[in-house]
Amino acid sequence: MKINGNEIRPGNVIEHEGGLWVAVKTNAVKPGKGGAYNQVELKNLINGTKLNERFRAAESVERVRLEQKDFSFLYEQGEALIFMDTETYEQLELQKDFVGDRAAFLQDGMMVTVELYEEKPIGIRLPDQVTLAITEADPVVKGQTAASSYKPAVLENGIRIPVPPFIASGERVIVDTNELTYISRA
């Protein structure tokens, strides 16, 4: 579907320079001299590279609709992650580097959304929040209450995040998978 350059919004996926790009940020610019344009920060869906482009209002670009399917995470096999389509029960194998650092958050039976373009997976979305146990946390130092301070803690999946001083080893916490930050106690 063709759209004008000034209609590109964050989250839109477009075909540009022979690749698929997602708009991360957009900024409509109206200079005093010359025509208005849309300054767009793009991220390549395949290799993750970023690009800044200007699109004039008269320019048209191809907007791509991605198919989104729900999959359930089954298990890990070496460098491969195995998922199952919840509708057809077909299995899908993705490499760990496709998922990236967030692969550590995958748990048995976790529901994820896989984005497909022409039946080929190009992206994966994990739940925004997961509940994990703290395996290691520094003890609280008395008298550090003047300012809010966070201490480092290690989650059961090995990822280090800052947590409030009252969190101890063994407690379960809710973690934001996008920002890798503590949200609350579970």
Swiss-Prot record:
Its main location: cytoplasm. One of its GO terms (cellular component) is cytoplasm. SMART domains: EFP, Elong-fact-P_C. This is Elongation factor P. Belongs to the elongation factor P family. GO terms for biological process: peptide biosynthetic process. It comes from the Bacteria. The keyword Cell wall biogenesis/degradation does not apply. Involved in peptide bond synthesis. Stimulates efficient translation and peptide-bond synthesis on native or reconstituted 70S ribosomes in vitro. Probably functions indirectly by altering the affinity of the ribosome for aminoacyl-tRNA, thus increasing their reactivity as acceptors for peptidyl transferase. Pathway: Protein biosynthesis; polypeptide chain elongation. Gene3D superfamilies: 2.30.30.30, Nucleic acid-binding proteins. It is found in: Cytoplasm. It comes from Brucella abortus (strain 2308).
